[in-house]
């Protein structure tokens, strides 16, 4: 499996956009809608996967680059007017093929929260805690259901729920439990000793 993990590590970097410090959804499509597509949630999810791989195959330069990808994805993908991470974006500001692009979905926020926790545990840089506060505040205000548990999945750009359902063909019980489990495990490993 080691060789497959190395291949996965190498396969991610052709998607890297150094100007924006993000991972593009598709590589090699030049100036097409598919080639300009950025999904903050996917970029952040792949970035934390890469940090896990880099724990197995250490490379300080790549690790720094992945931390830049997390920061770039958060900065580029964050809606400065209404908060939250966009679902999809065209990196040149053109319309996307995805009609739901301006929506805010639950799963990019779960990926972002775990990514910043992991980035902080690796770097110790407090900027990740500022991002954690911003992400946590947004996610728990807009997605978490304090009365019945679980998370709602879909908000419009302004942060208003568009659907009250908590499960469908796309929203299952995967992203929320995974980010909670990984976050708890990470925090327990880094808990100060008594």
Give each language-model segment a name.
Residues 1-194:
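Glycan-recognition and catalytic cores of secretory/periplasmic carbohydrate-active enzymes
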